[in-house]
């Protein structure tokens, strides 16, 4: 009989060469995470959602070597066939839909608490130690900062765990700290900066908000921030852990480096005119109503994404009024009605087959 784990960590993967040595990076990061969770005795599962696997490459479950394990952690790999990827704008060009992949894992998570996690990031020792206290509360959503590190080569893949964390800490070039939002946005003051890397709340709260929003494109812009504001509207108070953090090794595909706003001349003139006459509220309202400035992501320029004001700010403002009638996904979100192939590559002692 399976006992409910305390924590589910949900990641997504696709063996498509998105980053160099992807499979090796993933195996290293998974093993690292398993060892951390075991060290701090966290009854947990790591769910890897393999989304739209390329037919000419091996599945990730076949590439993963021994992850070790001391009995506290299960690792499950759930495979989502390619036909589920078809449809959203840009699907032929980008093989991953992060929202949909994450939702598959979140919907199938067994843990009392659930967080998404990019599988190539690393939790600090302080963060896993904090999780190991097993004192999370269902009325909260937990956040921490992501620290970006730049490594010169791939030699870090061979470092022991403690040395890797020390090396990452020495090579930080950017901290994704809490941002101060414009008062014109009329939203809660929440820590949305890079929040998709650690957005920890109860499984019940994830069900309340129906996971990440449904996105008609493969870009999935603003979805983590929207989820955080939705959770707050549904009653979760934010806790920002200051001493705990996540490390990310930055490569050329990092999202923030690829997104640009698109202004038309009339929009710039109108915006400057209104702001210059202290009509900031009207300027913001027009950005929402007329949907500008819109956005493009490098490599997917054919998709003109909605403005942050239309896609995020307007929703966050409604959530600030506790308007939970705003629902951003279907009742069967996360492919809840579909039976998907699953393989357990590491089984915890609590997880009896």
Task: Put a short name on every predicted segment.
Residues 1-38:
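N-proximal low-complexity "stem/linker" segments adjacent to membrane-targeting elements
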Residues 6-10, 45, 226:
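Cell-envelope/extracellular polymer assembly enzymes that use nucleotide-activated donors
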Residues 42-55, 76-83:
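Short beta-strand/loop segment that forms part of the nucleotide-sugar
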Residues 58-108:
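Active-site-proximal specificity loops/subdomain of glycosyltransferases
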Residues 93, 106, 124-215:
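Conserved catalytic core of nucleotide-sugar-dependent glycosyltransferases
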Residues 98-103, 120-121, 128, 194-198, ...:
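Conserved glycosyltransferase catalytic-site signature
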Residues 111-124:
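Short beta-strand-to-loop acidic/aromatic patch adjacent to the donor-nucleotide binding site
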Residues 187-188, 193-195, 215-353:
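C-terminal catalytic/acceptor-binding lobe
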């Amino acid at each position: 009989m399976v006992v409910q784990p305390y924590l589910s960590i949900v990641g997504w993967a696709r063996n498509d060469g998105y980053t160099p040595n992807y499979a090796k990076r993933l195996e290293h990061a998974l093993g690292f995470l398993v060892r951390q969770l075991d060290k701090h005795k966290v009854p947990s599962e790591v769910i890897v959602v393999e989304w739209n696997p390329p037919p000419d490459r091996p599945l990730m479950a076949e590439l993963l070597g021994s992850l070790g394990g001391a009995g506290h952690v299960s690792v499950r790999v759930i495979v989502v066939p390619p036909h589920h990827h078809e449809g959203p704008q840009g699907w032929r060009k980008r093989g991953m839909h992060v929202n949909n992949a994450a939702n598959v894992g979140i919907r199938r998570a067994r843990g009392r608490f659930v967080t998404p996690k990019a599988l190539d990031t690393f939790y600090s020792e302080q963060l896993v130690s904090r999780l190991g206290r097993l004192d999370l509360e269902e009325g909260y959503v937990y956040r921490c900062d992501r620290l970006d590190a730049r490594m010169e080569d791939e030699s870090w893949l061979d470092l022991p765990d403690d040395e890797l964390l020390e090396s990452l800490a020495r090579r930080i070039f950017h901290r994704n700290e809490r941002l101060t939002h414009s008062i014109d946005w009329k939203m809660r003051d929440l820590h949305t900066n890079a929040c998709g890397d650690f957005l920890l709340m109860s499984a019940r709260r994830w069900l309340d908000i129906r996971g990440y929003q449904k996105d008609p494109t493969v870009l999935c812009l603003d979805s983590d921030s929207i989820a955080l504001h939705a959770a707050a509207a549904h009653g979760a108070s934010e806790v920002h852990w200051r001493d705990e953090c996540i490390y990310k090794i930055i490569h050329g595909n990092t999202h923030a480096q690829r997104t640009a706003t698109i202004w038309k001349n009339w929009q710039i003139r109108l915006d400057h005119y209104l702001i210059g006459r202290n009509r900031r509220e009207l300027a913001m309202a027009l950005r929402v109503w007329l949907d500008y400035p819109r956005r493009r992501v490098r490599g997917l320029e054919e998709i003109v994404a909605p403005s942050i004001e239309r896609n995020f700010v307007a929703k966050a403002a409604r959530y600030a009024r506790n308007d939970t009638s705003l629902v951003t996904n279907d009742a069967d979100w996360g492919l809840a009605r579909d039976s998907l192939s699953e393989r357990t590559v590491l089984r915890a002692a609590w997880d009896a087959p």
